[in-house]
Every structure is written in C-alpha cells, then in structure tokens.
C-alpha cells in the first residue's frame, strides 16, 4: 500500500513538472549543442542513408514532433496569460478612434471575435522568441558554432525590428491613415470592432514583417547571393520596388501615408547595404581562412 501511494505521488508530481521540463529543455539543448561540431557528411550521402534506413527519417520526424508540441504548449500558455490583459490591449488599440465606446458591434459574436483575435496575436507575440528557440534547437545539430551564435543573435534582433515596425505603425502611421479613411468624401463611418481590430493588427503585423528586410539582405549576402556593390548599383530599382510595396501595404491611396511607409523602408534599404557589406566581408574572411588551411595541409603532405 505504501509503495502504491509513493508511485501515485511520484507520477502526479512528474505530470505537474512535465510542462516546466518541456520549457527548460530547449535552453539546455542550446547550451549543449552550441559547443558541438556537426558531422561533415555530404548531403547526397545523408539522403542515401535515409533511403537505406527509413528509421533515421522517423527519428527526425519524432524530434520535430517534440519541438512542435513544446512550442504549442508555450503558445497556449502565452495566449491564456495574455487573455488577462486583452481588454487593456483593446483599449490601447482603440485610442486613435476615441476608445472602445466608439466601436459599434453589429453581430452578436463580433466583440468576442475581436477579443480572441487580440488575445491570440498577443500570446503569439509573447511566445515568438521561444518558438524561434525551438526552431533553432531543431536545426542546431547541423549547424557550426559560428552559425549557431549568429542565429542566437538574430532572434532578439528580429524581435526588436518587428516591435519597432509595429510601434512605427501605431504611433506614426495609424493616425493619418485613419483620418483619411474616416473622413473620405465626408461620409460618416460606423466603426465595427472586428473590422477595426483586423485592420490595425494586420497593418502592424505586415509593417513589422517589412522591418525584417535588413536581416533578409544580411542572410542573402552571407550566402553570396547579393553584395553591397550590387545593392548600391540597383538603388533606383529598389526605390521603385519599395514604392510598389508601400502602395500594396498602405491602406489608403493618398501620398502622405504612402510616403510614411516608404521613408523607413528606404532607410532600411540603405541600412541593409551596410549589413550586406559586413556579411560579405565576413564571408570573404572565412573563405580565405579555409583556403589558407587547405594550402597549409597540402604543403604538409
């Protein structure tokens, strides 16, 4: 009887501790993996081994399943936590139009839908760094030390750029956009919660994604696809492309709001040129180091 009670309590505490162990495990994996070098097996040999031994693919899928499960657990917890602050977030988002009392719900479930949308997006934003860490933990065994450190640095930088883009949308771009839309042709507009929240959160999301442009250029330059010189030479075409992108993202057709979107994107483009130069320089140094080591080994032979 005593053993049964002990086993029952042990299993109970294991179940209680399982979510916390699942959360801590990726951070432990990061510390362990960051000092291990990957196996330099050619990609063709890897595919051949997978075909010959399907169990290898099953092992990778099982590892991916564990990472996805942990990410979903953290996302669910983040959404539940954010639900306690969702009303305050809704009030903050509705400040540009005079508060929540300025919204008019037509459908019965409209307010609930807007509430759940903000709760999910807030929880996703909170959980996004952890989800990125789970992706990193899955890819980590095949990365070199320098690549691991670079990815770990990119995660907070990407998060900061996204938050900067969302803040730029809310504090600078949203007021003139709403002023144009709500007073267009002098027609009185009844603002619905679902439409307004979808409009604001969608605009903040896509502008936040647009602010990731320097990181994308840095990655392409590190892979040798682009370089700073080609970006400088093609700046006119880049500005033209930015104009089309701003026209697609901007919710209005007036040049003021389009210019508000274009200006930071142009600044980000020229910032990307500097980051591309850094990435190209680092890539050249690594290639020179590899060639030097190869030449030294040939002389020894």
Can you describe what each PLM-predicted range is?
Residues 1-301:
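Membrane topogenic/interface segments and analogous intrinsically disordered interaction regions
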């Amino acid at each position: 009887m005593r053993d049964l009670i002990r086993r029952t309590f042990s299993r109970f505490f294991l179940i209680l501790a399982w979510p916390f162990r699942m959360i801590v495990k990726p951070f432990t994996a990061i510390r362990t993996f960051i000092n291990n070098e990957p196996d330099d097996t050619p990609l063709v040999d890897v595919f051949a081994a997978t075909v010959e031994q399907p169990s290898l693919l099953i092992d990778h899928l099982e590892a991916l399943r564990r990472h996805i499960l942990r990410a979903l657990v953290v996302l669910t917890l983040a959404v539940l936590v954010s639900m306690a602050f969702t009303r305050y977030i809704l009030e903050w988002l509705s400040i540009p139009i005079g508060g929540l009392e300025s919204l008019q719900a037509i459908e019965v479930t409209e307010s609930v839908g807007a509430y759940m949308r903000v709760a999910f997006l807030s929880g996703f934003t909170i959980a996004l760094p952890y989800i990125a860490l789970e992706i990193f933990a899955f890819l980590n065994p095949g990365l070199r030390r320098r690549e691991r450190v670079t990815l770990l640095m990119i995660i907070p930088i990407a998060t900061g750029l996204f938050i900067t883009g969302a803040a730029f949308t809310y504090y600078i771009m949203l007021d003139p956009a709403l002023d144009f839309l709500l007073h267009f042709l002098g027609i009185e507009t009844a603002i619905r919660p679902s439409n307004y929240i979808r409009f604001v959160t969608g605009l903040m999301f896509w502008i936040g994604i647009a602010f990731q442009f320097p990181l994308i250029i840095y990655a392409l330059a590190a892979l040798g696809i682009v370089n700073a010189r080609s970006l400088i030479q093609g700046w006119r075409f880049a500005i033209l492309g930015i104009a089309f992108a701003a026209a697609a993202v901007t919710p209005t057709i007036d040049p003021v709001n389009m210019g508000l979107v274009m200006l930071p994107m142009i600044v980000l483009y020229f910032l990307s040129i500097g980051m591309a130069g850094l990435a190209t320089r680092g890539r050249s140094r690594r290639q020179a180091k590899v060639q030097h080591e190869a030449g030294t080994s040939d002389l020894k032979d």
